[in-house]
């Protein structure tokens, strides 16, 4: 972008205005990764739908969500203790790569409390959200 006008004189005001407009339409470069901590076991269908809503909320807020409880049940069996423990371990490893931990919901499950304890131990910033932040997630 050239800061000179048509007559080749410097026109910094117009140049800066154009730069500002271009910035508005470009996606933000840096998006911190956040670990999504929410219930999964119990009502798995409803809890997974809620977790997807929480992830969508994180994206709208400018973050990259990481929700291992949406990924690992795709190939690990939550009902088998060894595989559940492996999934929890891998989730904690993924948490170490995250900038913050976001805790959603009114209930703190046993798995969530383990994740929160690990986040505190690692010195991660923990944010608590009580209500569902996103209700327009389309399942289709």
What are these regions (language model features)?
Residues 1-140:
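Catalytic phosphate/metal-binding cores of nucleic-acid and nucleotide-processing enzymes, i.e., regions
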């Amino acid at each position: 972008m050239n800061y000179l006008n048509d007559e080749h004189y410097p026109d910094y005001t117009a140049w800066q205005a154009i730069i500002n407009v271009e910035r508005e339409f470009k996606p933000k470069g840096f998006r911190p990764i956040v670990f999504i901590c929410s219930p999964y076991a119990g009502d798995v269908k409803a809890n997974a739908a809620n977790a997807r809503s929480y992830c969508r909320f994180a994206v709208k807020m400018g973050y990259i969500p990481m929700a291992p409880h949406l990924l690992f049940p795709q190939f690990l069996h939550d009902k088998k203790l060894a595989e559940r423990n492996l999934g929890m371990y891998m989730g904690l490893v993924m948490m170490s790569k995250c900038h913050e931990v976001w805790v959603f919901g009114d209930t703190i499950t046993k798995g969530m409390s383990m994740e929160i304890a690990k986040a505190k131990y690692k010195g991660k910033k923990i944010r608590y959200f009580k209500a569902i932040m996103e209700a327009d997630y389309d399942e289709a």
